[in-house]
Amino acid sequence: MHTQRKRNIALILLAAALLFTGPAYGSKEIRFASVSWTGVTVKTELAKNILNSIGYEADNKVLSVPIVYKALDMGDVDVFLGNWMPTMATIANKFLDKGTIVQYVANMTGAKYTLAVPTFVYEAGLKDFSDIAEYADKLDYKIYGLEPGNDGNLVIRSMIEQNMFGLGDFEIVTTSEPIMLSEVKAKSKEGEWVVFLGWSPHYMNQIIDMKYLTGSTAETFGENDGTATIYTNIRQGFDKEQPNVAHFLKNLIFPISMINEISLMLQTNKDLKHGEAGMAYLKENPEVYRGWLEGVTTADGEPALPVFEDYLKSY
C-alpha cells in the first residue's frame, strides 16, 4: 500500500514537471517581450536577430506594459528591454520589490518621457504643467495618451483623478503611437491646440515641431522634466540559467543618436521593418555591435563576433 502511494506521488510530481512550459536550464530558447513602440521594438528585434544569428532560438512577444510584467513575473518570458523609469514605477516596482523581476542594466540614459505640445502652442504660453488648465478650452479638455494600460496613461489619469495642476475636468484620449502622432500632426497643421505624450529618442522629434513641458513632479513624470532611464529587465534566475546571453545583455547599450537615426529611417521608408533598419544601421556602424559582442560566444561556445559578421553580410 505504501509502495503504491509513493509511486502515485512520484507520478504526480513527474506530471507537474512535464507541464512546466519554461525553457530548460541551458536551453537555446530566449523569450523577449516588447510593446508596440518604435524604440523598444527596434532594440528587441536587433537583440533577437543577433541571438538567432549565433545559434539561439529567440522570439519576441508584443504585449501591453502590464501584461509584459505579469508574463515576466510568471516566468512566461525572459527579457524586456523597455523599462522606462521613473514613469513605469507604478507598474514595475511591485515586481522588482518582490524579486521575481530584476532591473538588470540601464540600456539607455538621457531619454525623455513627458507631456509635450506643438511649438506654436508653447510660444503662445503653454510651457509648463501648471499652464495646461489655463488653456483648457483651446485643448478641448483633452490630453492625448497611448494604448490602454500604458504607464504614461496611468500618470495622466492620476493627474486628472487627483486634480493635479487643476486638471480635474480633463480627460485622457486613449490611442496608440501611430494614431496619436497622426492626430498631433493633423492638429498642428490646422493650428489646433493639443497636449500629448512625447518622448525621445523617437522620430516624432524630427517630424513634429514640438516642445516638452516643464514642471513635472516625482508623482508624475519625474522631477527632472521627464528625463528617463531605460532598463533591461529579466525574470529572476535568467542570468544564472543563461550566463552568455546575460553577458550580451550587459553589453547591450543603445546610444540615443542610434535610435533616433533608425526611427527616422523607418519613418522615411514605410516598407522597412524594424529589424531590417536596425541591421542596416549596424552595418554602417560596426563599433556598436563589436562592443555588444565583446566576450560573447555562440550558443555552442564559439566566438560570436565572426559568426554575426558573416550573418550581417546578407543585409
Q: Would you name each region that the model predicts?
A:
Residues 112-123, 227-241, 264-265:
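A bilobed periplasmic-binding-protein/Venus flytrap-type ligand-binding module shared by bacterial periplasmic
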Residues 11-21:
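Bacterial N-terminal signal peptides
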Residues 252-315:
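C-terminal functional modules
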Residues 77-81, 151-218:
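Ligand-binding pocket segment of bilobal, Venus flytrap-like solute-binding proteins
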Residues 44, 64-99, 179-183, 203-211:
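Pocket-flanking alpha-helical
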Residues 99-149:
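A conserved helix-loop-strand patch within extracytoplasmic ligand-binding domains
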Residues 27-39, 56-61, 140-144, 249:
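Short, well-ordered beta-strand elements
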Residues 47-54, 136-170, 283:
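Ligand-binding cleft/hinge of the Venus flytrap
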